[in-house]
């Protein structure tokens, strides 16, 4: 129940009429067995339907994950992102972007060393940026708000950035 695709594959995740496209030089998907002793995750689960033929009858016994290597690109109607590498798990619907990730949402751009994008129903819910975080937001023609720091924690409302907290220098 795993696959490895190279030569610039594209994966499409469909849910409730919305699609998220993930492209990379190489994509891998596999199953991880469910461990009842494992520490519980702190975010809500988000179910998704993929274009893959996956047996979901025994959903409690395994967890699907996706890994993208080199030149990762993510596209959907509420955000776009690029990075060097990606890890995505169906447990918490979190995109973990590594290697100079950049995320665009509406009129905002977020960058940092490592970026975790928490989603719910394929819409961004929260973003956490580790080290060298920077957010740029266009306010008017040729005017921008820029905030940088060690870490950034941002929250979304209706798919748009609503609140941001930046710590450190």
Please state what every model-predicted region is.
Residues 1-169:
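Structural signature for solvent-exposed beta-strand/loop edge elements and short helix-capping sites
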């Amino acid at each position: 129940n795993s696959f490895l695709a190279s030569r610039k594959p594209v994966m499409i995740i469909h849910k409730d009429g919305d699609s998220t496209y993930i492209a990379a030089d190489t994509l891998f998907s596999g199953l991880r067995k469910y461990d009842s002793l494992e520490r519980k995750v702190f975010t809500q689960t988000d179910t998704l339907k993929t274009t893959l033929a996956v047996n979901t009858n025994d959903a409690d016994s395994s967890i699907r994950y996706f890994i993208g290597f080199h030149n990762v690109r993510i596209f959907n109607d509420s955000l776009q992102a690029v990075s060097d590498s990606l890890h995505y798990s169906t447990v918490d619907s979190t995109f973990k972007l590594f290697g100079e990730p950049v995320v665009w949402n509406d009129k905002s751009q977020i960058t940092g060393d490592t970026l975790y994008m928490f989603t719910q129903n394929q819409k961004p819910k929260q973003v956490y940026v580790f080290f060298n975080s920077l957010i740029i937001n266009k306010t008017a023609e040729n005017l921008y708000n820029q905030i940088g720091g060690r870490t950034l924690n941002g929250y979304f409302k209706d798919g748009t950035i609503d609140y941001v907290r930046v710590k450190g220098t």
